[in-house]
């Protein structure tokens, strides 16, 4: 007869595990609320549960379930029996907002199956991107060709908020032309020229993406100061600029490719020129924080790259020849790593 298992009062509770586990439903709930335009409905006026359910043709129970998740993460609040939007939702979840985040949900809906446990397991065992990301022509190549606009809008959603903050965290007074390498929609160029009136920007990306960047520049009223330059950032020379910006570019690539970017910028910039890398950074031990660790899993499934620590990116810039290297938290989970060419 086997010995009885001894049990004791646990030393710690299991809340962190439940937080991860319940995230399986949290993201889809917010996505469905977004898809059903529940938040847009509440932008018109505060409404009660029954009014919301009736307006969207929902039974009370599912309407309440979605609203509860949205309220729990701070998108809506309940006062006097009526739900209304919080500043978080007004800033990021309404299409009319210049810092709209909803395109991230829309684009990831197209490839949501890629982030299944099976897909992640395959990525872990093979150390290779999965699904639509496994194209031999490069990460995202075939999917990107078909869904370039979707992806560009998604990256714009992720970038435009922090783009309105980081240019205030670093001295750009002496700089006149910013090269936005792999700049996508040009969100960071838009933010930089809006906040720094003496600055102009060039978005360097593939030709179809440059066309979209031009549309965004028009939309934000900065087309006279944000231009585009269709090019391959590996093969083609960089146009003249005294400020190089890389927003979510380094994390797409392994260290040797990132070192290539750092050296290419060092060789291209004039003395006094500056490089700025904009990423979510690991701590120096690469053990957190959790959002960055989770983002790193995204990179594992999607690209050959990874999230980096401030120590790793600083070392890359130093090895390339940059000096006056600084790391500055900017907005939310974002930071910049910056250096100057002597």
Regions found by a protein language model. Name each.
Residues 2-78, 172, 177-342:
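Alpha-helical subdomain
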Residues 4-8, 14-46, 54-55, 61-176:
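Conserved Class I S-adenosyl-L-methionine-dependent methyltransferase catalytic core
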């Amino acid at each position: 007869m086997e010995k009885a298992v001894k049990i004791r009062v646990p030393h710690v509770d299991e809340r962190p595990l439940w937080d991860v586990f319940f995230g399986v439903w949290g993201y889809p709930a917010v996505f469905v609320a977004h898809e059903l335009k529940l938040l847009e409905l509440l932008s018109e006026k505060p409404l009660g549960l029954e009014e919301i359910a009736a307006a969207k043709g929902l039974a009370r129970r599912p309407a309440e379930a979605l609203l509860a998740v949205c309220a729990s993460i701070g998108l809506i609040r309940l006062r006097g029996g009526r739900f209304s939007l919080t500043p978080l939702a007004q800033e990021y979840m309404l299409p009319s907002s210049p810092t709209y985040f909803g395109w991230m949900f829309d684009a990831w809906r197209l490839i949501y199956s890629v982030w299944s446990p099976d897909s992640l397991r395959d990525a872990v065992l093979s150390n290779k991107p999965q699904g639509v990301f496994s194209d031999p022509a490069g990460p995202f190549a075939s999917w990107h060709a078909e869904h370039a606009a979707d992806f560009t809008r998604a990256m714009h959603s992720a970038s435009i908020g922090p783009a309105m903050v980081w240019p205030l965290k670093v001295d750009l007074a002496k700089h006149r032309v910013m090269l936005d390498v792999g700049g996508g929609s040009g969100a960071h160029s838009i933010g930089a020229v809006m906040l720094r009136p003496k600055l102009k920007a060039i978005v360097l990306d593939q030709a179809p993406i440059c066309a979209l960047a031009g549309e965004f520049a028009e939309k934000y009223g900065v087309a006279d100061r944000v231009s585009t330059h269709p090019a391959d950032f590996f093969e083609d020379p960089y146009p003249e600029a005294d400020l190089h910006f890389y927003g979510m570019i380094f994390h797409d690539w392994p260290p040797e490719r990132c070192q290539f970017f750092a050296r290419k910028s060092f060789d291209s910039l004039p003395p006094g020129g500056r490089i700025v890398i904009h990423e979510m950074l690991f701590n120096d031990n690469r053990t957190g924080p959790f959002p960055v660790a989770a983002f790193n899993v995204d990179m594992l499934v999607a690209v050959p790259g990874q999230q980096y620590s401030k120590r790793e990116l600083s070392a890359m810039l130093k090895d390339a020849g940059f000096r006056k290297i600084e790391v500055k938290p900017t907005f939310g989970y974002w930071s910049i790593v910056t250096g100057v060419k002597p």
